[in-house]
């Protein structure tokens, strides 16, 4: 069981069994009182109430059937990138905080960030911190191993050398090790 919403001695209580349990419980309660997960991203109206009541008893969704549920921001330009540029000054932690909130409200917990011209961990060092604080597990796409964005290699290509493991093993190993070291305190699924 990930979270339980219940009443104890007349008080509404949200109990959790893991890192995201309280968050999911709060967002479930929010949804039940009329706040759409899309309230910010799609300007979905929030239902207003003069009074709210909670029935005595216990409510839970139980454990999710799939452990990692998430999205991949693919082909981010021009749509997503332009929107982020206009709203937040770029694809950065401010933009990702809204994406992460939407994901959590939809009970998602796994994210592959934008990759065309982005370096999630380097463009804004707050991005991985916010992901971790919010309980989002980070991953990378199939061609971005060891938590290294492709653009991280592109920006270092002159110092790293060829993307060829048969001739450049030492430099590529060091590049990958640095990515793992940088992200070791965060919750990641490594490709």
Question: How would you name each of these model-derived features?
Answer:
Residues 45, 65-191:
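Aromatic-lined carbohydrate-binding surfaces of glycoside hydrolases
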């Amino acid at each position: 069981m990930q979270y339980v919403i219940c009443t104890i001695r007349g008080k509404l209580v949200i109990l959790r069994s893991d890192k995201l349990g309280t968050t999911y419980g709060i967002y479930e309660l929010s949804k039940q009182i009329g706040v759409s997960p899309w309230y910010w991203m799609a300007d979905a109206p929030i239902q207003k109430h003069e009074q709210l009541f909670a029935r005595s008893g216990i409510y839970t969704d139980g454990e999710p059937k799939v452990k990692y549920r998430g999205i991949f921001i693919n082909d981010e330009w021009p749509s997503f990138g332009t929107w982020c540029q206009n709203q937040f000054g770029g694809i950065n932690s401010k933009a990702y905080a809204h994406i992460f909130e939407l994901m959590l409200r939809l009970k998602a917990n796994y994210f592959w960030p934008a990759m065309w011209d982005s370096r999630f961990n380097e463009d804004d060092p707050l991005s991985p911190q916010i992901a971790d604080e919010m309980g989002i597990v980070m991953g990378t796409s199939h061609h971005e191993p060891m938590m290294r964005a492709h653009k991280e290699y592109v920006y270092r290509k002159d110092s790293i050398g060829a993307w060829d493991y048969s001739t450049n093993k030492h430099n590529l190993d060091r590049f990958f090790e640095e990515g793992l070291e940088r992200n070791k305190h965060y919750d990641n699924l490594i490709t």
